[in-house]
């Protein structure tokens, strides 16, 4: 039973979001870590993300039946009743928001609320099923965790928070389109209007390329804005160039699904590398040098 309640929260998504939360938090901390705040923020965001995922599973249980990769989800198989899942999701959300409000700060909590509302209320309930722009809207909620981590420390939505929002929102687009390409038949069967299905894979490849270019520019802004150091800059440039190269090779491949899986896989590597580098390579306030931890 515990396993089923864990599975419905999508632990893989929670883990991925925690990496970005840590990146945002440590970037803002600049080497001076408030450990109780760190724990409250991580647990709070984890609970909010878990709540959103359970609500998403509840909302999507009809279309999940039609998709190969989701047909065995807990709610689809009836291992947890829909009513119980709603109570479970609500309790997780309340606990998460309370931790962010009282353990971090009101701004972190409100950012969590906004990300949650966009994901559950706007994306899951409507945009995912009715608009080709659903992925774009969903990307905003996906970018909330690192911003929450950052603002939990600063208590202020400054240019650093805005840059993080841009980086992670732009990253979501090629990442999500790659999934839609190698899971094309699933999305088609469930009648989900993602870009590759509605406009075609060729158009999706153009969008992927443009979004990776925009992502590359956004990643550089952390250093140019005085938030991250040169080691971060080198890694950001390297992963962006490599990712862009992979995207461009997509115009010549014979098997789009194989290419999309590789692009998706590298997207995970790219965002993890950036999260790690912004955690350890930050600009110290009032310093003339871009300093970092000594490796």
From Swiss-Prot:
The pathway where this protein functions is:
Porphyrin-containing compound metabolism; heme O biosynthesis; heme O from protoheme: step 1/1
Cross-referenced CDD domains: PT_UbiA_Cox10
User: Where this protein primarily resides, as one coarse class?
Assistant: membrane
GO BP annotations of the record are:
heme O biosynthetic process
How does this protein lie in the membrane?
Answer: Multi-pass membrane protein
Broad class of enzyme this protein falls into: transferase
Instruction: Cite a single GO MF annotation.
Output: protoheme IX farnesyltransferase activity
Periplasmic topological domain: 28-36, 97-106, 216-227, 287-295
The residues exposed to the Cytoplasmic compartment are: 1-8, 56-77, 126-196, 247-267
- Name the PROSITE patterns for this protein: UBIA
Report one GO cellular component.
plasma membrane
Q: What is its EC number?
A: 2.5.1.141
Q: Where in the cell is it found?
A: Cell inner membrane
Tell me, what's a Pfam family for it?
UbiA
What's in the keyword line of the UniProt record? Cell inner membrane, Cell membrane, Heme biosynthesis, Membrane, Transferase, Transmembrane, Transmembrane helix
Which residues belong to the signal peptide in this entry?
none
Miscellaneous comment text of the record: Carbon 2 of the heme B porphyrin ring is defined according to the Fischer nomenclature.
Kindly give the PANTHER family that the UniProt entry links to this protein: PROTOHEME IX FARNESYLTRANSFERASE, MITOCHONDRIAL
- Write out the similarity annotation: Belongs to the UbiA prenyltransferase family. Protoheme IX farnesyltransferase subfamily.
Please state what the protein is called: Protoheme IX farnesyltransferase
**Gene that encodes it:** cyoE
């Amino acid at each position: 039973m515990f396993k089923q309640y864990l599975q419905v929260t999508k632990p893989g998504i929670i883990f991925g979001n925690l990496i970005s939360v840590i990146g945002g938090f440590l970037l803002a901390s600049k080497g001076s870590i408030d450990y109780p705040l760190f724990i409250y923020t991580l647990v709070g965001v984890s609970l909010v993300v878990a709540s959103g995922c359970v609500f998403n599973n509840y909302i999507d249980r009809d279309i999940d039946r039609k998709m190969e990769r989701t047909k065995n989800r807990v709610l689809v198989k009836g291992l947890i009743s829909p009513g119980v899942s709603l109570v479970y999701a609500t309790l997780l959300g309340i606990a998460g928001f309370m931790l962010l409000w009282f353990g971090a700060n009101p701004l972190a909590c409100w950012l969590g609320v906004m990300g949650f509302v966009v994901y559950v209320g706007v994306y899951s309930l409507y945009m995912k099923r009715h608009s080709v722009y659903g992925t774009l809207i969903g990307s905003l909620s996906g970018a909330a965790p690192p911003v929450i981590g950052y603002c939990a420390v600063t208590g202020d939505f400054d240019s650093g928070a805005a840059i993080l929002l841009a980086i992670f929102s732009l990253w979501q687009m090629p990442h999500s389109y790659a999934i839609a390409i190698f899971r094309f038949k699933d999305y088609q069967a469930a009648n989900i209007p993602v870009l590759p299905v509605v406009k075609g894979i060729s158009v999706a490849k153009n969008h992927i390329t443009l979004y990776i270019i925009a992502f590359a520019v956004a990643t550089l802004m952390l250093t140019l804005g005085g938030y991250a150091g040169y080691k971060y800059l080198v890694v950001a440039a390297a992963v962006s160039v490599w990712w862009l190269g992979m995207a461009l090779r997509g115009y010549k491949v014979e098997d789009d699904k194989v290419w999309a899986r590789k692009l998706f896989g590298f997207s995970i590597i790219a965002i993890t590398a950036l999260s790690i580098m912004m955690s350890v390579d930050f600009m110290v306030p009032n310093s003339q040098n871009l300093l970092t931890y000594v490796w």
